[in-house]
From Swiss-Prot:
Superkingdom per UniProt: Eukaryota
Protein's GO biological process: negative regulation of transcription by RNA polymerase III
Subcellular location: Nucleus; Cytoplasm
Keyword Cytoplasm in annotation: yes
Protein name (Swiss-Prot/TrEMBL): Repressor of RNA polymerase III transcription MAF1 homolog
Cellular component terms per the entry's GO annotation: cytoplasm; nucleus
Family: Belongs to the MAF1 family.
Molecular functions per Gene Ontology: RNA polymerase III core binding
């Protein structure tokens, strides 16, 4: 997976990382090419040892509770769409590789499984869910940003041709599962024809938790500076660094 430069996304991202008073919003939109090279090919070969690329993997139902296989069916229909809530292992690899590239080097998603992903029922539902979360958090600032945001995404990925997936991990695996996390979402807009994924990730962190962490980090840095003054330079490299987690 290769991160593709996009100046429109950079402009939008600068407005998705803000402090709202009682919370911090941290969001980003990134575009990735699905063309594999080097390490990706090696990882894909290892991934395929558990199943061939065309094998279908069952996904979890979307958090809406509405399965894509049910859209367009009458309420009395009992049959279940065999493909709607599944994806090929190759597509699953693309989703996992996107997470790895986006969160590198802090997290490794190589062990992620299909049940941690969902296929979303429709573009409209995803757009409304994103808009609702960000309007509640950012108010009028997002109202003015919204058309530019979705125009930039559509221009990059052609939304009408996309399958949309989300990552909804267990708490133990969630990179946003730390204390103080108020909400988060992780959406993948996958255009198979373009061999490209746009990844939209956002979270809201309690202002108290975020400030407390920053204050702790500053204190750690002050302590390290004092240690630098007190200790011989030859021993400085052996000291463990303090981190705010």
């Amino acid at each position: 997976m290769k991160l593709l430069e996009n100046s429109h996304f950079e402009a939008v991202n600068s407005q998705l990382c803000v402090e709202t008073g009682d919370a911090h919003i941290i969001g980003r939109i990134e575009s990735y090419s699905c063309k594999m090279a080097g390490d990706d090919k090696h990882m894909f070969k290892q991934f395929c040892q558990e199943g061939q690329p065309h094998v279908l993997e069952a996904l979890s139902p979307p958090q809406t509770g509405i399965s894509p296989s049910r859209l367009g069916k009458s309420q009395g229909a009992d049959e279940e769409g065999p493909l709607s809530d599944k994806c090929s292992r190759k597509t699953l690899f693309y989703l996992i590789a996107t997470l790895n590239e986006s969160f590198r080097p802090d997290y490794d998603f190589s062990a992620a499984r299909a049940h941690e992903f969902s296929r979303e029922p429709s573009l409209n539902w995803v757009v409304n869910a994103v808009n609702s979360s960000l309007v509640s958090a950012l108010g009028d600032d997002f109202t003015s940003l919204r058309p530019n945001l979705w125009d930039a995404v559509d221009e990059e990925i052609n939304l009408s041709e996309c399958d949309i997936y989300s990552y909804n991990p267990d708490l133990d695996c969630d990179p946003f599962g730390e204390d103080g996390n108020l909400w988060s979402f992780n959406y993948f807009f996958y255009n198979k024809k373009l061999k490209r994924i746009v990844f939209f990730s956002c979270r809201s962190i309690s202002g108290y938790t975020y400030t407390h962490c920053d204050a702790g980090a500053e204190l750690d840095m002050d302590l390290e500076e004092e240690d630098d003054e007190d200790e011989p330079s030859s021993a400085a490299g052996d000291r463990p660094q303090l981190m705010c987690i």
